[in-house]
Structures are given as structure tokens and as C-alpha cells.
């Protein structure tokens, strides 16, 4: 049985201060560019990718204002977007920068939506719990 999901997000291990969620792929790549961790040719490639997205993907006002939101691509309408983002994922892999591809049908409370993406509100709360006893071999 194939699983189908409505939304996808690429994020890293780094936690964004304003959301307490993993930084998104654009944040991760820009940080690598700013920290000179990419060769110039690769930095230029990412800048081209980012420019393409700036031209083709609306920028949610909540993101412009650095509000605590997380953006997700819509899987059904974003084939071209996801094709373009694969090159940025390749750059992360080339520089051994870990990332996760997360799929969901429930990204949270949607505060912005366009043809290609949604932005969801985050509450700024990160819940950390102990493992349940069963994970320690106890019954």
C-alpha cells in the first residue's frame, strides 16, 4: 500500500530560534554560503536556485516578518518546485550537511496558503520526554 501525503518539508538538525523547529533547506544553504563552507561555484549555484524560487514561489508575509511559522511544500502542486530543490539537497549532501525530508498530512494550523505551499503557525514549545520503560528492556 502506497502512502500519500499532502505536504513535504526539508529541514536540518539545527533549531531555528524563532520557531524551535529544524531550519528549512533555504536557511541551511544560506548559512553555508555565509559561513564560506561552499566552494564559490556551488554557492553561485545555490544563489541561482534561490533566485528561481524568489521569482516563482510567493514569499509568505509571515516569513518576511520572521514570525514563528514553518513552510511546507504541497506535494500535489509542487513537482517543479521539488525538482528544483533537489539540487539544493544535493549541495547539502556534497558538504555532508545532514537533513531530513518530512512528509505529513497535518502540518499544523495553516496561517498562509498559496498554490505551492502552506505556512503553519508554531507555538514555540519544544516538548522533550523520557523514553517509556519498554525501551529500556523493562516490562
Question: How would you label these PLM feature ranges?
Answer:
Residues 17-20, 45, 57, 82, ...:
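Generic detector of leucine side chains in alpha-helical contexts
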Residues 5-7, 22, 82, 115, ...:
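Low-complexity, intrinsically disordered short peptide segments enriched in small/polar/basic residues
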Residues 90, 94-139:
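Acidic, proline/glycine-rich low-complexity IDRs
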Residues 1-77:
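Long, contiguous N-terminal structural blocks used for assembly/anchoring
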Residues 58-111:
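Short glycine-rich, low-complexity/disordered patches
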